[in-house]
């Protein structure tokens, strides 16, 4: 898995270093059986940049927490031994740490947990998951929670981030 994390936000979002975001992304892609040569970029940006992206692509004003920009149409694998998974560029997940920080403060949990949650959320969108309908939302948010909790459990951690966060 090729995962690149770029911090162009001008912030150092502690205690969630870029390496932990990359490790989480690899975990999510591995758990969902995405081709091992798939490529993903996670970019942290400032509010001005996120506002510009949000307006350009969603026609909505102001910054948001996470946006996903799919490239090649990759889907989760089924886990069959003989399955022929597609390889390619999954896409980009763009995070805004200052928005994540405000959301984390309102929700009463750490900004690092919020960034992990938003990264998981963004990757699921790249893989075709959505939350426009109640059944889709339940499926996506249950999977999001499971992926995040299994990642943190492997590290001997828990999260205070609510699984419902990251509704973008």
Describe the predicted segments one by one:
Residues 1-115, 124-168:
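An acidic/histidine-cluster motif and surrounding catalytic segment
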Residues 118:
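Residues within the DNA-recognition helix of helix-turn-helix
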């Amino acid at each position: 898995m090729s995962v690149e994390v770029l911090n162009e936000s001008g912030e150092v979002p502690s205690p969630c270093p870029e390496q932990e975001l990359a490790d989480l992304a690899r975990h999510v892609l591995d758990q969902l059986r995405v081709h091992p040569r798939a490529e993903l970029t996670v970019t942290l940006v400032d509010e001005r940049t996120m506002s510009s992206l949000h307006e350009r692509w969603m026609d909505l004003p102001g910054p948001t927490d996470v946006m996903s920009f799919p490239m090649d149409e990759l889907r989760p694998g089924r886990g069959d031994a003989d399955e022929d998974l597609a390889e390619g560029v999954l896409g980009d997940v763009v995070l805004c740490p200052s928005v994540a920080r405000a959301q984390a403060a309102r929700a009463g949990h750490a900004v690092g947990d919020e960034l992990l949650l938003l990264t998981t959320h963004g990757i699921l969108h790249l893989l075709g998951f959505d939350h426009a309908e109640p059944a889709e939302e339940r499926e996506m948010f249950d999977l999001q929670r499971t992926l995040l909790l299994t990642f943190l459990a492997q590290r001997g951690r828990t999260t205070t981030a609510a699984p419902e966060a990251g509704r973008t």
